Regions:
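Acidic, metal/ion-coordinating pockets
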Residues: 1-266
């Protein structure tokens, strides 16, 4: 059987930085989504994924909210850059669910965010998906966001939704995906609560729980964000983990190769 390969391009925490500018000078900077996207090499066995926190955090983000009044401009940008899947970050709720809906409603990419449901419901609003690549490889994709949104966000901005504990939500989705996926991938808008080399506790809160996700669940790939911390690809408890820095300073490229029963992820 011939090898089958999945390539993933991953960004996170762009915070509205689309162009190569920091808005502080006229000099071009080595940041921004367009800089990253110009290097994506996409084919039928490639997925382009974002880990959330796109809508808020830059003068452009403020202009789109204050002057245009909806998120369609950012949807158009993501469409142009060829995104396939996104999850939600805590700052994507900063302008309320109507604004968020105007972004998602015009987005070609699928949103996956398993722990976000309607206030009086239990089914996820943005459920996990199985994406079949051109080569036949089946990729099970789950998204989750830190439930600290409930602590930080203005109540009126999230009045119509419920954001639950990410781990039970991800675990339930993973259980459904395992038998129908060749590769399982989780997009987590959250970071690491422990040092990856030593296991030393960095934070005892529930804000960042990527280390625990790797301990308790068995995704093949965990794409993280939120901390604005560059984490090079490495394996933790059998799960391949990465995190890009913020504002499009870098993107992550992950390759998974399946050769019979063997998986190689780099």
């Amino acid at each position: 059987m011939a090898d089958k390969k999945l390539t993933v391009y991953f960004t996170s925490d762009l915070h509205g930085y689309i162009y190569p500018t920091d808005y502080r000078s006229r000099d071009e900077r080595d940041i921004g989504l367009f800089k990253c996207a110009s290097r994506f090499e996409k084919d039928g066995n490639t997925l382009v994924i974002d880990g959330g926190d796109l809508l808020q955090g830059s003068p452009l983000g403020a202009f789109c909210h204050d002057t245009i009044g909806d998120g369609r401009a950012f949807a158009g940008i993501m469409n142009r850059c060829g995104y396939d899947y996104v999850t939600l970050g805590n700052h994507d709720f900063n302008f309320g669910t109507d604004y968020l809906g105007s972004y998602l409603g015009n987005l070609n990419a699928r949103c996956v965010c398993e722990n976000v449901s309607a206030k009086n419901g239990c089914a996820p609003l943005y459920p996990a998906r199985v994406h079949t690549l051109e080569n036949g490889l089946r990729v099970g994709i789950v998204g989750i966001v830190t439930d600290y949104v409930n602590i930080w966000e203005r109540p009126e901005h999230i009045a119509s939704i419920r954001i639950s504990d990410p781990i039970p939500a991800a675990a339930a989705a993973l259980e459904k995906l395992k038998s129908i996926s060749d590769v399982t991938l989780c997009i987590y808008h959250g970071g690491f609560e422990r040092d990856l080399a030593t296991g030393r506790v960095l934070s005892a809160t529930h804000e960042n729980i990527a280390y625990r996700i790797c301990q308790e669940l068995d995704f093949d790939i965990l794409l993280t964000g939120h901390q604005h911390m560059s984490v090079p690809g490495q394996t933790l408890f059998g799960t391949f983990v990465v995190q890009p820095s913020d504002r499009g300073q870098e993107f992550i490229r992950v390759e998974a190769v399946l050769s019979g029963e063997e998986k190689r992820i780099t």
